[in-house]
Design a protein with these regions (language model features):
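Conserved histidines in hydrophobic membrane contexts and catalytic metal-binding motifs
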Residues: 1-352
Length: 352
């Protein structure tokens, strides 16, 4: 196969991936951009849950009592956050919701200064929950995550073929950075944005495939249910005893012991302290909270603990496919019109 034939083959693959899957790629990528800063968006959508208030003036157990009275009977406390705005308590409902996506979580928000109840509801806004479910499974029951994984393969292939097609056919490779490689704005946007976002988009696609790989291979069809841990309804240590053993200062997030891990997890800054619920033994993770909490490929994909620069790149990596999809389709339609005009002119000339 000659270089021209190979380039044309890559072009056809790149073109038809973009045309056929644009309507799926665009919302999938945009929801990914939303999830990079899901906490910030949740604050915008539910401002009352994050309203500024005074410093914590009560003991953690007092906040816990307020939350228990506000939650439905039979709810199981999972976590508490103290020190950043209102105190937030997260719990699982008495019965599974039966809804698709991650298990439903209830939230209770408490004024830290007075201990008064601010509000109750889902732990995150319905919009953000929808974004999580759509990005992870396209709202498709069962096989949705596998479908998203194969879309990641297509996106990775599109990124690689796009980079190949960006490379100038003649002359120095630096010609590829020229803004006016083409006579139309959409084509110039497509080539310039496509080059700069190709590597981040490829990383996003590859890590997305890794996350979905078990489901793509037909195993572990419900990973959230398999990995779900049940918080202990009754613990040996009280909340106050666990925090006293941890000896932490400032904002903290406390996670309750579970049936699989019988330890209190107390996150303070970049430090994770574990307190054994049976004997109060304390251990400290010296390598940081984030690295223990999530694998590196997941943090590459969602930006957790990766710094502002990478989060901005990920955000743009979610916006770019929308621009590339629209400009690519415009370029394709223009080419179709041009070919139709050429064919009509040839037919007119032949008829004379």
């Amino acid at each position: 196969m000659s270089k021209v034939q190979l380039r044309n083959a890559w072009f056809q693959i790149h073109k038809w991936i973009g045309i056929l899957l644009a309507l799926v790629f665009i919302p999938l990528s945009l929801t990914g951009s939303m999830l990079v800063w899901d906490d910030a968006l949740d604050r915008m959508l539910e401002p009352s849950h994050y309203a500024p208030s005074g410093p914590a003036a009560l003991s953690p157990s007092q906040y816990l009592d307020v939350a228990r009275h506000a939650l439905p009977a039979g709810s199981t406390i999972q976590a508490m956050r103290i020190g950043e705005g209102p105190v937030m308590v997260t719990a699982s409902p008495p019965k599974p919701s039966g809804m698709r996506g991650p298990p439903l979580r209830l939230g209770v928000w408490i004024d830290p200064a007075s201990g008064k109840l601010i509000g109750t509801g889902l732990s995150n806004s319905p919009v953000m929950r929808w974004a999580h479910i759509f990005h992870g499974s396209l709202q498709i029951p069962g096989s949705g995550r596998a479908v998203v994984g194969w879309l990641g393969v297509a996106m990775l292939l599109s990124s690689l073929t796009g980079l190949w097609l960006w490379w100038p056919v003649t002359g120095s490779w630096t010609r590829g950075f020229r803004w006016k490689r083409h006579t139309t704005l959409d084509a110039n946007l497509h080539h310039m944005i496509g080059f700069w976002i190709a590597l981040p988009l490829g990383i996003l696609s590859l890590t997305g495939v890794i996350i979905a790989w078990p489901q793509m291979m037909g195993s572990d069809t419900n990973p959230m249910r398999r990995a779900m841990q049940t918080p202990l309804a009754t613990t040996h240590l009280t909340l106050d005893q666990a925090l006293t053993a941890a000896s932490v200062q400032g904002p903290v997030t406390i996670t309750w012991p579970t049936d699989k891990e019988g330890v209190w997890k107390i996150a303070s800054g970049q430090k994770m302290i574990q307190v054994d619920d049976r004997n109060g033994a304390v251990s400290v993770a010296k390598d940081g909270m984030m690295s223990r909490a999530r694998p590196f490929y997941r943090r590459l994909h969602d930006g957790t603990g990766m710094g502002l620069v990478w989060q901005i790149i990920l955000f743009l990596g979610g916006i770019a496919p929308a621009v590339l999809g629209v400009t690519g389709i415009v370029m394709w339609l223009r080419t179709r019109r041009w070919r139709a005009d050429v064919a009509q002119r040839k037919a007119t000339i032949a008829a004379r």
